[in-house]
Regions:
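Hydrophobic faces of well-ordered beta-strands that scaffold small-molecule active sites
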Residues: 52-56, 94-96, 134-136, 185, ...
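Hydrophobic core
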Residues: 12, 16-20
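Extracellular glycoside hydrolase catalytic/binding regions
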Residues: 75, 167-170, 174, 179-182, ...
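An active-site-proximal structural segment forming one wall of the substrate-binding cleft
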Residues: 74-93, 109-140, 144-184, 206-219
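Sec-dependent signal peptide cleavage junction
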Residues: 20-35
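Solvent-exposed loop/turn segments at secondary-structure junctions
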Residues: 58-62, 93, 99-104, 140-144, ...
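N-terminal carbohydrate-binding accessory modules
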Residues: 31-93
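Bacterial Sec-dependent N-terminal signal peptides
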Residues: 1-11
Length: 271
């Protein structure tokens, strides 16, 4: 129930913000299907199309000792039957939290393990192949409480963090660049410096920088990514610390496709 409430809150937030912003066996099949038509939906249309969402939590973001492990938190492996059950219950969107952690090779250009990306893609295909929206993010990598967490806005080594973050999103975005509008990328989840209370301006500036890197990097990978809806959070995905004067900055979208009508936006905010 908590996951459903969280997902519903995200979709409702998308509606408010968008309005205010004037396995290898399935890979080939989906890539071909995804590359056929991209429907450019404006903020009202995408909100209606996504409807109520369901969060597939404690699965692909689960980890043990710094290594992603889909069953580490006690859930069985995700199946297409689960996605279909959610669809039958009236959900139109599925959020898929994903942790990468040790699946990223720091000694090889921050390359993400291909078998892990295959599994992420397989779960995405469960959704889009059944005409549902899928939201894919970077999840536990930004937690100070998760072993191996590295996307840490309070860290002093921001140069390395930003390079790693950019490299990761280049790979994720490239993997999915031919998917249609049913796929949405979310930059990160509940990112903050681990200290509850008033946000640190310095750490918040790093979060803003991550969001800008995310938008620019995804757009530049080409395919359909230059017109795809993107989802970004503020401090700890907190509505007050995002909407009020605590330091949040909406990223610019300089590489948005010319196919998008002038004045229209393609960035959502998660709160």
């Amino acid at each position: 129930m908590a996951f459903r409430k969280k997902a519903l809150a995200i979709v409702m937030s998308m509606a408010m913000v968008a309005t205010s912003l004037s396995i290898p066996t399935t890979t080939a099949k989906t890539a071909e299907a995804a590359g056929t038509t991209f429907n450019n939906l404006n903020q009202s249309q995408i909100t209606e199309a996504m409807g109520v969402g369901y969060n597939l939590g404690n699965s692909l973001e689960a980890a043990s000792s710094g290594t992603p492990n889909e069953t580490a938190y006690g859930n069985p492996k995700l199946t297409e039957d689960l996605v279909l059950a959610a669809k039958d219950a009236g959900f139109k969107s599925i959020r898929i939290p994903v942790s990468y952690l040790s699946m990223i090779d720091d000694n090889n250009g921050y390359k993400i393990d291909s078998s892990w990306l295959d599994r992420v893609q397989q779960v995405v295909d469960y959704c889009v192949d059944n005409d549902m929206y899928a939201i894919v993010n970077m999840h536990g990598d930004g937690y100070t409480t998760v072993t191996g967490g590295w996307l840490l806005c309070g860290s002093s080594d921001q140069t390395k963090i930003k390079a790693k973050y950019k490299a990761c999103w280049e790979q994720i975005a490239d993997r999915f660049k031919n998917y249609d509008e049913h796929l949405i990328f979310e930059s990160m989840n509940e990112e903050f410096d681990g200290t509850y209370g008033t946000p640190s301006r310095t750490a918040y500036a790093n979060i803003n920088a991550y969001n800008q890197i995310f938008v620019d990097t995804v757009r530049k990978t080409g395919g359909n990514n230059d017109q795809r809806w993107l989802l970004i959070p503020g401090w700890n995905t907190n509505i007050d610390y995002t909407a009020e004067n605590y330091g949040f900055a909406l990223p610019t979208d300089d590489y948005l496709s010319s196919k998008i009508a002038s004045g229209e936006k393609r960035i959502m905010i998660s709160v």
